[in-house]
């Protein structure tokens, strides 16, 4: 019996970690198919219908690089293109993010902090939410963790030259994959550049009384400056990034085109006083700050206060604690830089989900603080952990309540449910949908009940796929006229009872009310052939 207990004790951390992963998977997959796909997911689902060259083209006129779409197409070849299948790729990267975070923290700290960090990530409302969405955010989070691990092994930790070389290669691959997946991933390597500059400056200051910021004041320390830059670009730091830049050359013309387009036309609202509070509130509770009550606000402020006080004390007592400041850098600097880059005269690009890569490091940072506090302030540490767990569990319940609600202005998408309502009336109904809503509806087209496009395609470049001949359009396809009747589903306030085809007359209408608050969401119009 003692031997069994001893073995169990040795395997306890492994069992705990498997329990954490299992819990995360249960939470994610329990409701992964509950919501109808919304526009961003629908764009992902639609673009993978094309070949790789066409995906490259249609991505180039949108706002993201193509790597995620390439992977999603390959994934769909094995697992299908249902909502469940497409979202499962994000769940896969969500799990990998937690696993990689565990091994990163175990390497730089210890097993106890690694388990707590994994636990925080497993119940993180934001990580759960975007592990259920057919978009690239969890893939970027995974690549960000991999990048930081590779950076640490290649340029911070004591390692053999062979290991350093291996991790430099992994770093190059991770950074390449990241910037070919989402542009804002670049905030992670930029944060590492800043950390490395300060890290080398501090080491040089310790040895030679060199101050990086005194150089910026143009003091005469030419030898020290030369030494700083020599150390900074040493260990193949510069050459590694030159390789990354070289491998990115094929996409640079498209990046420039997209950047110009985003500056001229983009949907993201300008920054205001609620931007940061909303980001913080969504991280903890998956709820905008304006919708929280006094108690939730108090919980968030208490957590933030503990983080700020601990960080300040850390700065005062251990100025050269590189590992803590590495995690702090990739937690905070991306948020700060994205905020600055979104200020006028630039177009705002500040969206919570774009910062998921930084938020996973915030969870790691909180785990580090919690365990370190436990060493001499147990009651504060326990309170800190309890508040985080409570906030995240509350956020998970909010996730379930808000299924089908986009964070883009609270837009509700239940097009799958509306289509099911039509098919309940007529099993093999021909259904027409216009505008960008077509992308979401097309996901639910089948051979018995086809989804068609009607009207003028959207003027934005993301509507180019609709303009393609691939898209079935009722005005251009004579086979559509074989239908004795058809249905149009449109947003409730933009329904038009005039038939888009002269061969049909309006017959009747139905309302589809959303399942969240009962308000009218879509108008369903029935047309019968003359």
Model feature map: region roles:
Residues 14-158, 165-203, 212, 225-528:
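Membrane-proximal helix-loop-helix interfaces that form the catalytic/acceptor-binding platform
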Residues 2, 205-206, 216, 221-223:
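Targeting/processing segments of secretory and organellar proteins
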Residues 1-9:
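Short, Lys/Arg-rich, polar N-terminal cytosolic tail immediately upstream
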Residues 208-210:
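Conserved cytosolic catalytic headpiece of P-type ATPases
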